[in-house]
């Protein structure tokens, strides 16, 4: 699939403003170039990210954001290599993925992979202070992990609160 580029990418790259990508963005976020495989309103570049980011030159991107997208990708190795290729040496990537223990993660048939605490350490040279070291021979990426946040939210927390409030109201 050839990318459909709905923005003047050459002008954006020539500009001094930071280049910030939003991968898997079904809508436009201010100041970011949104990339998705669906040609929806607000999508700047329509591309199959399973094939990488070939439409971007090396070291051209200041930041990459991705939220609840990478679990839908088959070829994560290639996409991570492409992120490494297009990020500037001072570039940052901010990735949010659901933890494998999320009860809703298994119900979504479009989820193709699972992520745990150590998943992104396979793409990092930093080991982030974990006790368990992960193998570093799978790829040539040398991302440095600056922070990891693991959040567990109970899907029943608010349901129980509503039931409690209803019960209290019915006393």
Language model regions located:
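Generic structural motif recognizing short loop/turn segments at the entrances and edges of beta-strands
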Residues: 1, 16-17, 31, 139-146
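Class I SAM-dependent methyltransferase Rossmann-like catalytic core
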Residues: 1-11
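Conserved SAM-binding loop
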Residues: 8, 16-101
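Polar/charged alpha-helical tracts
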Residues: 10-15, 168
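S-adenosyl-L-methionine-dependent methyltransferase catalytic module, highlighting the catalytic core
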Residues: 77-78, 84, 88, 92-171
